[in-house]
């Protein structure tokens, strides 16, 4: 039996790893649209941009992993169609590959600007190694950097840029940074720290157009009429799941490929995991699409156990982390529908602990610069009754 994996990110590669761990002996083939071996994505918005680490320092798996585990990986080979009747995928170069089981692990794509000037040189996105190398080059050449979007990735890029001595402005459409992922207490502490480092924030601000000169960006124009100087604009306004293959294969989609608890789609031979999958998360208590390393690894283990017929691993709370100018931010659990927050903050040491409760049950935690405490709290978050 041949298993084909479309996508060579954390989800896809770890699915192949767990298939071997669970004893699968058949052929495994991973297809990647990129020309480089699978790599870790988190460093791309941090140390990689400041040249503290090189491309060779971020492999997803050690050298020899694919050969030692008899996993075939085809680089620079995008899959463009699925024939569900014949159980065949076709690559861009016209070749066909048969599968018994197909795992869709396609990464999300950056949401792109559509305003006037969005196609000018100097407007950059960050999702891939190629994007990161391009952005790293442009950071060297730029003095004024505007980051559109105050989410985790945007703030990581802003932190890297200010660390390189650039003048940095973050434009965020909502009243606070990281509004979708952290509490106001964490957001305010992070913003205060980054402002102290020299980053300027424009909150409740909407970009209306980009002005340029000789084909290159020069200014961002806000709805208020304010104009902000920019040699480089980094866009971090969210990501969109890649659903073209699933849609053409007539799979059920809804802001992601809809899957059951075993990561199986509406076609029993096709699975979806990671960024592209809309799956029920027991801690969120609903169908949700999450773009985190923890989610990708969890999905990979579940799909492998399902295919191999082994017991499904026990669920663990969702988690994320970031590193922002000396602030180790960690989140655990599903931060929604809480009825009580317990906040402990030390502005001098930049330490924060937030405990979120629902009906006296701990459902989520946030910490800044308290890694041991976060680890101790992990076991306290239980599945809803």
From Swiss-Prot:
Keywords: Cytoplasm, FAD, Flavoprotein, NAD, Oxidoreductase, Plasmid. Induction: Induced by AlkS. It comes from Ectopseudomonas oleovorans (Pseudomonas oleovorans). Pathway: Hydrocarbon metabolism; alkane degradation. It is an enzyme of class 1 (oxidoreductase). Its cofactor is FAD. Involved in the hydrocarbon hydroxylating system, which transfers electrons from NADH to rubredoxin reductase and then through rubredoxin to alkane 1 monooxygenase. GO terms for biological process: alkane catabolic process. GO terms for molecular function: flavin adenine dinucleotide binding; oxidoreductase activity, acting on NAD(P)H; rubredoxin-NAD+ reductase activity; rubredoxin-NADP+ reductase activity. Belongs to the FAD-dependent oxidoreductase family. This is Rubredoxin-NAD(+) reductase.
């Amino acid at each position: 039996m041949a298993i084909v994996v479309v996508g060579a990110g954390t989800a896809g590669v770890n699915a192949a790893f767990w298939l071997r761990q669970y004893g699968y002996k058949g052929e495994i083939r991973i297809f990647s649209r990129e020309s480089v071996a699978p790599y870790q994505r988190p460093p791309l918005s941090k140390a990689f941009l400041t040249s503290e680490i090189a491309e060779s320092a971020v492999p997803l798996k050690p050298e020899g992993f694919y050969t030692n585990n008899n996993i075939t990986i085809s680089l620079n080979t995008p899959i463009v169609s699925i024939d569900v009747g014949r159980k065949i995928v076709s690559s861009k170069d016209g070749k066909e590959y048969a599968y018994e089981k197909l795992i869709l692990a396609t990464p999300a794509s950056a949401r792109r600007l559509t305003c006037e000037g969005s196609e000018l040189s100097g407007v950059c996105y960050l999702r891939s190694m190629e994007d990161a190398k391009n952005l790293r080059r442009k950071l060297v050449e730029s003095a004024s950097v505007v980051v559109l979007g105050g989410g985790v990735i945007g703030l990581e890029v802003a932190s890297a840029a200010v660390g390189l001595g650039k003048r940095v402005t973050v434009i965020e459409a909502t009243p606070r940074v990281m509004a979708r992922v952290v509490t106001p207490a964490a957001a305010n502490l992070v913003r205060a720290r980054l402002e102290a480092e020299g980053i300027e924030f424009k909150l409740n601000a909407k970009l209306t157009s980009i002005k340029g000169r000789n084909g290159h960006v020069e200014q961002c124009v806000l709805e208020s009429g304010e104009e902000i100087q920019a040699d480089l604009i980094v866009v971090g306004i969210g990501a969109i799941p890649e659903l073209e293959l699933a849609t053409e294969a007539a799979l059920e989609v809804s802001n992601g490929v809809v899957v059951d608890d075993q990561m199986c789609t509406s076609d029993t031979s096709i699975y979806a995991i990671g960024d592209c999958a809309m799956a029920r998360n027991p801690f969120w208590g609903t169908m949700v699409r999450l773009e985190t390393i923890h989610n990708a690894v969890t999905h990979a283990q579940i799909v492998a156990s399902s295919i191999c017929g082994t017991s499904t691993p026990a669920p663990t709370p969702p988690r994320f982390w970031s590193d922002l100018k000396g602030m180790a931010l960690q989140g655990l659990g599903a931060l929604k529908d809480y009825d009580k927050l317990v906040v402990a903050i030390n502005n001098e040491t930049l330490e924060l602990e937030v405990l979120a409760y629902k009906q006296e049950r701990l459902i989520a935690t946030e910490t800044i610069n308290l890694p041991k405490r976060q680890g101790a709290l992990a076991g306290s978050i239980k599945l809803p009754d």
